[in-house]
């Protein structure tokens, strides 16, 4: 059989089997994670034990000989051995073809690709990924990467079988993919891409959704389509759905359960709240999508999010969560990351992050996620993210290592080797500085910004500015993590002045926690912030159950006109909520014979 070694699929298989980067030596031989307290106390003292950090060195373009010796120990693992057998079979037919086929041109290429796809499907079928396999997420990333490559030519024999084996929780994946990409390709040629907002919504967040949509429609004067996803009749009652779709133009509701896209036995989404979010992203027909939590408050129009340079370059716009360290949890997270990235190493973006350098256990805040589904890599990564939120996987791995759905978005891109973009700054704070506590800037509202102009380079990573570096060096010299009180910072010092100059360049984007001061306690007391802040480190105070920011850069509310904007948002949100309460009290939207409580 004649096989073209330059075939794209052949090259992709070779890269997938051995990886483009030098591999870290495997330290553990167990096949599953030990989440016991004993494991949580594990520490990594020597550089050889350290799973990641500044001492990690990555070879950008290792030679084949270096690749062989650095991957040898990885190939001893079960998943590595399976890939090795697959690679050897592939090379056997490359180097020693059994017979020639009298075909030429595209026919020869199609024959080669079909043969390798058959081998790959057999590998996926014979080696299903278990929820707690030590390197299961890494293997799933490899399979997702291959899937994205094959999306360019889905007419290959066995492709749909591979698709079904890879995404068994979506029985109609072939129909979903065909309908979506036919529309997306047509849209790219004949009409503008379709933009929309997607939100997973339950009855407990009805008030927040009212305020969110009121702000979009009345404050920003945006008519961007909005889809509200729920799961089952009890999740979002009919009278609430009726009000949302009649009061606001261009708003629709979608029952994911009735939609029938997903296998409930595998996804187990009933009464799961945030786990619905990646499935809503998969289900929507929008091309460019903003996924939003109901309690997110936009400080810029939704259209501005889609215009960010990082989004245009990569098809993704991600925001960081709080920069917070917790030793017990860090051991589990670092073990997971090392196990699943030891074969390839981190991407350039991840290698530079505070998360990788063990300065925090949170990386992404999923209150706002912006993606371009017309890109095949983005589409494939969203399927991988949804897989991480299926019932057994989230219960046995994802939600035991991380905190809900948050990390499943960027992690899908990272493990599949796809490009993605994060705003540079980790979450800051907005609120009343020193209102009741001297521990720092305590706030229930993480604050997010757009990058300052000029901080994005061509590959989507961030160019570290001299001002940020100067602030970091000054803070490091002044105090260790969380050891210096913010009151001791001299506002006239060079470091503080440089930090404030840098902060003026960013633009407020959004914050978490709704317009309420404490949403879990009162539905009537609205925020009245006196300052906003970026940078610094977060600390959780166990006794008072408060999140407080230390060593931050504080800015007045007058900066960027944020004080005026917040007051206008509160006014718009309260008017929208008042209309809703009035309609509900009159019973205008109650189904016949139904009684319900008026939302507080």
What are these regions (language model features)?
Residues 45-600:
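Glycosyltransferase catalytic domains, chiefly GT-A lineage
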């Amino acid at each position: 059989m004649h096989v073209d070694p330059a075939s794209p699929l052949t090259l992709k298989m070779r890269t997938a089997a051995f990886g483009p980067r030098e591999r870290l030596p495997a330290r553990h031989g167990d096949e599953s994670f030990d989440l016991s307290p004993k494991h949580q106390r594990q520490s990594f003292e020597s550089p050889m034990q350290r799973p990641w950090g500044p001492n990690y060195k990555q070879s950008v373009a290792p030679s084949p000989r270096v690749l062989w010796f650095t991957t040898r120990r990885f190939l001893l693992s079960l998943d590595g051995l399976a890939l090795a057998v697959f690679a050897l079979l592939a090379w056997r037919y490359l180097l020693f073809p059994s017979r020639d086929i009298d075909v030429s041109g595209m026919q020869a290429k199609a024959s080669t690709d079909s043969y390798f796809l058959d081998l790959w499907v057999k590998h996926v079928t014979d080696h299903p990924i278990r929820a707690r396999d030590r390197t299961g997420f890494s293997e799933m990333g490899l399979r997702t990467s291959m899937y994205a490559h094959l999306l360019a030519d889905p007419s290959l024999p066995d492709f749909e079988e591979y698709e079904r084996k890879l995404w068994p929780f979506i029985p109609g994946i072939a129909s979903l993919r065909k309908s979506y990409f036919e529309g997306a390709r047509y849209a790219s040629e004949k009409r503008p891409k379709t933009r929309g907002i997607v939100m997973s919504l339950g009855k407990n967040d009805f008030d927040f959704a009212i305020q969110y949509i009121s702000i979009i429609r009345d404050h920003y004067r945006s008519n961007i389509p909005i889809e509200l996803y729920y799961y089952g009749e009890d999740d979002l009652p009919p009278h609430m759905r009726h009000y949302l779709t009649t009061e606001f133009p261009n708003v629709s509701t979608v029952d994911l359960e009735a939609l029938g896209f997903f296998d409930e036995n595998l996804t187990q989404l009933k009464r799961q709240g945030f786990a619905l979010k990646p499935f809503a992203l998969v289900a929507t027909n929008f091309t460019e999508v903003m996924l939003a939590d109901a309690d997110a408050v936009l400080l810029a129009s939704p259209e501005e999010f889609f215009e960010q340079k990082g989004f245009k370059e990569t098809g993704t716009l991600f925001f960081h969560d709080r920069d917070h360290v917790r030793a017990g949890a860090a051991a589990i997270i670092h073990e997971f990351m090392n196990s699943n990235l030891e074969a390839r190493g981190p991407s350039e973006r991840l290698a530079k992050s505070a998360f990788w350098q063990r300065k925090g256990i949170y990386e992404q805040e999923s209150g706002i996620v912006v993606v371009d589904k017309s890109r095949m890599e983005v589409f494939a990564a969203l399927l991988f993210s949804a897989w991480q939120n299926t019932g057994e996987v989230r219960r046995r791995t994802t939600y035991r290592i991380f905190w809900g759905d948050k990390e499943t978005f960027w992690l899908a891109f990272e493990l599949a080797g796809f490009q993605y973009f994060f705003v540079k700054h980790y979450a800051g704070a907005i609120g009343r500085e020193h209102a009741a506590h001297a521990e720092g800037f305590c706030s229930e509202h993480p604050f997010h910004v757009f990058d300052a102009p000029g901080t994005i380079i061509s590959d989507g990573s961030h160019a570290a500015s001299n001002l940020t570096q100067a602030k970091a060096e000054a803070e490091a010299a002044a105090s260790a993590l969380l050891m210096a009180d913010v009151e001791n910072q001299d506002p006239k010092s060079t470091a503080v002045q440089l930090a404030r100059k840098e902060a003026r360049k960013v633009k407020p984007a959004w914050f978490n926690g709704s317009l309420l001061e404490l949403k879990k306690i009162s539905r009537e007391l609205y925020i009245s912030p006196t300052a906003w802040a970026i940078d610094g480190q977060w600390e959780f105070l166990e006794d008072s159950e408060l999140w407080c920011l230390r060593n931050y850069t504080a800015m007045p509310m007058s900066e960027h006109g944020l004080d005026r904007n917040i007051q206008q948002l509160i006014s718009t949100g309260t008017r929208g909520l008042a209309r809703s309460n009035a309609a509900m009290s009159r019973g205008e939207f109650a189904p016949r014979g139904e009684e319900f409580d008026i939302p507080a």
